[in-house]
Amino acid sequence: DYSINWNSGRGYYNENDSLPYKPNSNGRPRAFSSIPALHQIAAYAEDNFTWNINKINHLRANVGLRFTSQQPFSNVSTTSLSPRVNLSFAATRWLDIRGGIGLNSKTPGLDYLYPDRKYDDRVAANYMPQNDIAAQLLAYHTQVYNVEYSKGLKNATTTKIELGLDLKLPGNRKLSFLAYRDKTPNGFGSATEYFTYKSNVYTDQSGLIITPGAATTINYESPARQDIVFMTTGRVGNTNTTVNKGIELDFDLGEIKPINTSILFSGAYSETKTWSTDMNSRSVASVYLPTSFSSYNTTPFKVVYPSGLDYNMYRRFINTLRLVTNIPSLRMVASFTAQAIWYDYSQSFVANTTPIGYITTDLAYHDITSDMQNGYLGINGKYYSSVPSDVSSVKISDMNIKSSDAVPTKNPITWNLSGRLTKELGNIGGFSLYVNNMMYYEPYLKSSTTTTLSQRNTNTFSYGVELYFNL
């Protein structure tokens, strides 16, 4: 299978890329046509195997292999082989055991392969006298960085493992359990690397040529201040790790024949944990810096901490009840679904960490060893064992990160009701009427960490008509 996708239109754009899209936006709309076309080649093969051990016990196997190549023969090409094996064993007349293992590769999107240029807009002059409109001036320094194509980016590969039980119960009822675990150790994310640039600031004290009643001009040779600014290159890498696991239940309670209604009940508990293996770096907190840095949102160096210790955790327990009624005489099917989220948990965990290094404005990396923890870092980027008298400094232990704010959040129980009515129109097709969140349940509720009420279940209400035809 071969496919190609390309958008030749420009789309929504700025008429002048030298100007910010809006104040302090740090970005520009990107033309769709600036992104190369997407080429993909894929091939898939599978085979099924059945072994009838005896009249009761049967073993079924499904083996598959998928090959994918994106942007073949280019310097950003990615390829993958994704094998999978699914097994099912009939242990008794009423019990089937099934399991599977496989790899699933996700190709990077075009925004990852061909990142857009990065823009950083900083105010260079801000002179706004209220009584002299003609002299008012607002000027920006715009730093543009051409981000390189992601030549070393790999497919994000997920290892999927699952084990399930299928039970056949009296009355044509069925009960199924499924446990699963998926791990993606190389998901897409930022691969932090820095460059620095110099940004001049001009004020009425130095650099601005002010003539009352006339336009203010700038003497670019006489800035009031020059800042050295850190900026990331926008490089993308395989720096995200995700582990997703859980258990699912499906219970087919059979049919209530007098009213032609089937009852289906399901439940699921899931847990997702994500963390980054990217370099963990931060600016120095402004409270520890002199005003020459804190007032202008700059930092004398970047502080580096251990990676992979912070994570985001999400847990959820949900139940769904579905009723499906067939009305043969009217050639109609009505369905009603009730869903409740009993448990909704999230946590952004920040570990207790101490600095392990720092990056100075010349982009040199310096280690911070355990015996340096009681020392000081000067704004000149040098280490001091005691407080220096001739330069402002930051105590290294003050830059330790504490996890005191890592409090889990538990949201209150919410529920949702939806319905659908489908009508067949002979052999030509049919139509469906549907409504989601039919009770328009969007309550204001508080979470476990705050008494502030916030609206839940938002953007879930919708209704409409679907029309389909049989060709």
Go through the PLM ranges and name each one.
Residues 37-43, 77-81, 157-161, 241-247, ...:
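Residues that define the transmembrane beta-barrel architecture of outer-membrane proteins
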